[in-house]
C-alpha cells in the first residue's frame, strides 16, 4: 500500500467572483472539490465552503495564491493513510506526491559509488508525477492570454493605420494607444497576453530585423560607411554611459537611451531593454525613450537639411550625414526625400549600416551591465541572447541570398508589427500615470546624445566621404 504523503490541488477562481484568484468558488465547484477529498479518504472536518481552506485537522495551512493565477491547497491525512485502491482521475487538475511506507533512502554520499548511467537514474518510486497537458488546460491558457493578445494586435494595427493617415511616427502612436488602454485599468485581465508581446514578441521582432540588412547594398557605400557607423554606435554608447553617470542615472537606463540615439531609435531601445534586467523602471524608461527619440527625430528631420546646406555638404555627404545622425528610419527617409531621391537612397543605406551594429551593441550592453552587477569583474563570457543569434543568422542568410525577396518583405512587415505591439504592451502595462511623470535627467541625456551623435556624424562624414 502506498500512502499519499501530501496532496496538491490547483484550481482557478471564478471569473465573475468579487475576489477573482483568491479562492472564492461556486457551490458546484466546492462540492466537486469536497467529493474529491472524500474519495481520497480525507476527513470532512476542516473543509468549509464556499471558500475551501485547510484547518488544523488536515494540515493547518491555508490556501495561498499561486503566482496570481490560482491557488495551492496542501492537505495531510488526519492520522491515517489515504491509499488509492485503483487509479482514478478527477475532473479537476490534481497532483499527488507519493512515497513508499518505509524509511527514506540513504543520502547520495552514503550510497556506494557506481559506474555507468544506470546509477544516475531514479527508481520509479522516486520519480515525480507530472500532470499531462489536457484540452481543458489548453482552453484555460487560451482564455488567460487571449484578451491580451487581441489587445496587442489591435494596438499594432491601429498604430500603423493612424501613422499612414496622420503621417506621424507609428511607435509614438503605439505608446499613446497603450496609455489609453492602461487608463482603463484592465492590466489584470490583459496582463498575461500583453506579456507575450512585451517579452518574446519583442525579441522575435528584433531578430527579424536581421533580414533587412543587404550586404550587396553596403558595397555601394564601401567599407568607410561600415567603419563610420561603427564609430557612431560605439561613441554614442560611451558618451551615453558617461553622461548618464554624470546625471546620476542608472547604467541600464543610460544605455537604453544611448542605444536608441546611436543605432536605430525605438527598435534599438527595445533591443537594449531585453539585454538589461527586467524591471518596471527599465520598462518605463524604454517607453519614455521611445517617445523622446521620436520627437527628436522629427525635429532633426526638419532641421538637418538646412543645416547640411549651410555647412556646404554635397548631396552624397548630406545623405550619409542624415543616415548617421537621425535616430529613426522613417525620419531619415523624410530628411533625404526633402533634398532629392538620390539623397534619400544614400541616407537609407547609411542608416542600415548602423542597424548592422545592433547585434554587437546588444552583446556589449549585456557585458557592461554584467560587469557592473559583479563589481567590475566578469567571471566568464556569457553567450549572447537567442534573439541576437537570430538577428545574425537572418543577416547572414540575407547576405548569402538564401531568403527570397518576398520572404524578406514579409519578415520586415512582421518585425515592424511585433515591435509596435511590444511598445503598446509595455505602455499599457505601465499606464498613463507612470509615463506622464517626466524625468528631466533622462530628457537632458536624450538631447545631449542627439547633439553628440550629430557632431560625431558630421566629423566622420567629412573624414571618410
Swiss-Prot record:
It comes from Caulobacter vibrioides (strain ATCC 19089 / CIP 103742 / CB 15) (Caulobacter crescentus). The chain crosses the membrane at residues 135-157, 172-194, 219-241, 251-273, 286-308, 318-340, 352-374, 378-400, 405-427, 442-464. Residues 115-132 have a biased composition (Basic residues). It is a multi-pass membrane protein. GO terms for cellular component: plasma membrane. This is UPF0324 membrane protein CC_0425. It comes from the Bacteria. Keywords: Cell membrane, Membrane, Transmembrane, Transmembrane helix. The keyword RNA-binding does not apply. InterPro entries: UPF0324_pro. Residues 97-132 are annotated as: Disordered. It is found in: Cell membrane. Belongs to the UPF0324 family.
